[in-house]
Amino acid sequence: MTDLKPFLAKAASREPLTREEARSAFDILMSGQATPSQIGGFLMALRVRGETVDEIVGAVASMRSKMLTVEAPADAIDIVGTGGDASGTYNISTLAALIVAGAGVPVAKHGNRALSSKSGAADNLAALGVKLDVGPEIISRCIAEAGVGFMFAQMHHSAMRHVGPSRVELGTRTIFNLLGPLSNPAGVRRQLLGVFSPQWLVPLAEVMRDLGSECVWVVHGDGLDEITTTGITKVAALEDGKIRTFELSPADFGVSPCVLADIKGGDGVANAAALREVLGGAKNAYRDVSLANAAASLVIAGKVETIHDGMTLAAQSLDSGATALALDKLIAVSNDID
C-alpha cells in the first residue's frame, strides 16, 4: 500500500494501529509518498492519542530497514538519550561513552546535533575534533581501534528527510523523538537509554524486548534523559527477557548529590572544554555524573556485576588516561590520520 489515508483515518479515530500497520504507515512516510499535511496530521493523531508499544515497534522496524548500517562487535553498547528534556546539561553520555571505551567495552554511539539544547553529542564531538561525516568503514575502524565510534544520525537515516520539514513546522514532540535512539545503525543489543519523561520507561523497555535487545536500562533522572546525581533516577531494566523497575540515588554511586546548575553546560565548544577539564583531572559534578552513567553502562555490558565495581572501573579508565586515549584515537581515526 502506498496511501497513508487509511492509517491516518484509523489514527484520527483514536484506534491503535497494529505492528504491521504501523510499519506500513512509516514505510509510506519515509519513502516520500505522503504529503506534508498527511504527515503532520498522522504524527499529531498519534501524539494526541498516545503512541502504543506496537506502533513504536512497527515504526522502528521501518526505520531500521532503511538505515545505513555499521559493522560492530556483538558486545558493543550504546549510551544515548532521546533529548527533549530542555535541561541544557553537559554532554554526559558522550563522556560516559569515552570512559566505557577506555574500560575496554566497545561503544557504537548514535547521536545527533542539538534539538532542544545548545549542544548535542554531534556538536560536542565536532568541537573536540571528531569528524562526523564519515562512512561505515571508518566508523567500524574507530570502534576497533579507539574502542568507540560515532554514528551521526543524519548520515544513517536519510529517509528522515521526507518527514523533517513537517516535524519542524509542527514544532512539538512526535514519535520520531523516540525512534532515533531505538534505531542504532550498528544493531547494538545493549543500551543505556535515557528518556525525557518517566511515562516512557516501561513502554520503551517493552519495545526493546520485542525488538530483540539483550540488556537495556531505560532511565529518567530528575527531569533528565540521563542517570542523574541531582536526585533519584527511575529505571526500567530489560534483562534476560524480563523487565524490572527500581530507583538509583547518588549514594548508590558513592557520590555527593549536586544541583542542576552544577552540571549545566553551554554550546559544543564550551562543553568540549569542560570535558577536556575532566580528562585533565578535574574533580567536579560533571565527572561524578559521567562516572555514574559509565558505571551503569559497564553493568549493562556485563563487564562488571555491580554499580560499585562499575564506578571503580570507570574511575580507573578516567584516571589512568585510558579515556583520554580513546578520544585521541577516535579523533585520529575519524580524520583518517595514521
Swiss-Prot record:
Alphabetically ordered keywords of this record: Amino-acid biosynthesis, Aromatic amino acid biosynthesis, Glycosyltransferase, Magnesium, Metal-binding, Transferase, Tryptophan biosynthesis
GO molecular function: anthranilate phosphoribosyltransferase activity; magnesium ion binding
Residues binding anthranilate 1, per UniProt: G81, N112
Catalysis performed (reactions): N-(5-phospho-beta-D-ribosyl)anthranilate + diphosphate = 5-phospho-alpha-D-ribose 1-diphosphate + anthranilate
Keyword flag Signal: no
Enzyme class: transferase
Binding positions for 5-phospho-alpha-D-ribose 1-diphosphate per the UniProt entry: 81, 84-85, 89, 91-94, 109-117, 121
E.C. code: 2.4.2.18
Pathway in which this enzyme or protein is active: Amino-acid biosynthesis; L-tryptophan biosynthesis; L-tryptophan from chorismate: step 2/5
Sequence positions that bind anthranilate 2: R167
Cofactor(s) the protein needs: Mg(2+)
Cofactor note: Binds 2 magnesium ions per monomer.
Gene3D superfamilies: Nucleoside phosphorylase/phosphoribosyltransferase catalytic domain, Transferase, Pyrimidine Nucleoside Phosphorylase, Chain C
Binding site for Mg(2+) 1: S93, E226
One GO CC term, this protein: cytosol
Gene Ontology biological-process entries: L-tryptophan biosynthetic process
The keyword Metal-binding is assigned to this record: yes
One Pfam family it belongs to: Glycos_trans_3N
Binding site for Mg(2+) 2: D225, E226
Similarity-based family: Belongs to the anthranilate phosphoribosyltransferase family.
Assembly behavior: Homodimer.
Function: Catalyzes the transfer of the phosphoribosyl group of 5-phosphorylribose-1-pyrophosphate (PRPP) to anthranilate to yield N-(5'-phosphoribosyl)-anthranilate (PRA).
Protein name per UniProt: Anthranilate phosphoribosyltransferase
Lineage: Bacteria, Pseudomonadati, Pseudomonadota, Alphaproteobacteria, Hyphomicrobiales
